[in-house]
């Protein structure tokens, strides 16, 4: 219910911004599709590297992903709506349009670094506060956060990063199997990535 409230709040607060940025998507839909596709390919490759690191460390049990998998197994439709539609909208408006967009005016590398770090911490902090060894899972969210910033910047519209975020989460949700097994999906829940 918190994501439903946050989605409604963002739509009411930033509806004009979303509408204005939608024009850029309508002007160049092919560019958006290509950028999202290239970004997803880069996400997939970076995910292979991150999973390799986590396998080497024997740390494949990301508690955020585990929580989303458990919720999805109990209520797939609602969790799908939350992770594929609500979370990308809310999180992209916060981390890309808000933090990244504001800081980019002053210092582009700092904008990338701060947005990436805050997005990554957002997804794992609750679990890491209870068990500090869970901070390692931040590495699963850093690459996708970089790519979401890149997609936002290259598309010159928040809809580019929203589209990429939706794709990452949709594929991650698809990977959740009824038996509770999941493919490597660091972006599941809360997004993503």
PLM region spans:
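Selective recognition of hydrophobic, aromatic-rich stretches within alpha-helical transmembrane segments
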Residues: 1-8, 139, 143
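Short, structured coil/loop segments at alpha-helix boundaries
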Residues: 1-2, 11-14, 54, 62, ...
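Hydrophobic alpha-helical transmembrane segments of polytopic
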Residues: 2, 39-40, 115
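Hydrophobic cores of alpha-helical transmembrane segments in multi-pass inner/ER membrane proteins
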Residues: 3-13, 83-87
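Alpha-helical transmembrane segments
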Residues: 8, 12, 40-47, 145-149
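Structural signal for the C-terminal ends of transmembrane alpha-helices
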Residues: 11-21, 151-154
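Juxtamembrane helix-loop-helix connectors linking adjacent transmembrane helices
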Residues: 18-87, 182-190
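Transmembrane helix-loop-helix hairpins at the membrane interface
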Residues: 48, 56, 74-193
């Amino acid at each position: 219910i918190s994501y439903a409230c946050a989605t409604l709040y963002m739509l009411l607060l930033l509806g004009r911004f979303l509408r204005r940025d939608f024009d850029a998507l309508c002007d160049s839909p092919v560019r958006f599709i290509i950028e999202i596709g290239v970004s997803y390919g880069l996400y997939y490759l970076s995910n292979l590297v991150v999973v390799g690191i986590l396998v080497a460390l024997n740390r494949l049990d990301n508690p955020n992903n585990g929580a989303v998998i458990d919720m999805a197994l109990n209520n797939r439709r609602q969790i799908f709506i939350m992770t594929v539609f609500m979370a990308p909208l809310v999180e992209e408006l916060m981390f890309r349009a808000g933090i990244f967009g504001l800081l980019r005016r002053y210092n582009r590398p700092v904008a990338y670094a701060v947005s990436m770090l805050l997005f990554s911490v957002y997804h794992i902090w609750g679990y890491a506060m209870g068990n500090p060894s869970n901070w390692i899972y931040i590495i699963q969210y850093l690459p996708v956060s970089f790519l979401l910033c890149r997609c936002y910047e290259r598309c010159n519209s928040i809809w580019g990063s929203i589209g990429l975020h939706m794709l990452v989460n949709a594929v991650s949700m698809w990977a959740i199997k009824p038996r509770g097994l999941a493919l490597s999906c660091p972006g599941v829940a809360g997004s993503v990535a």
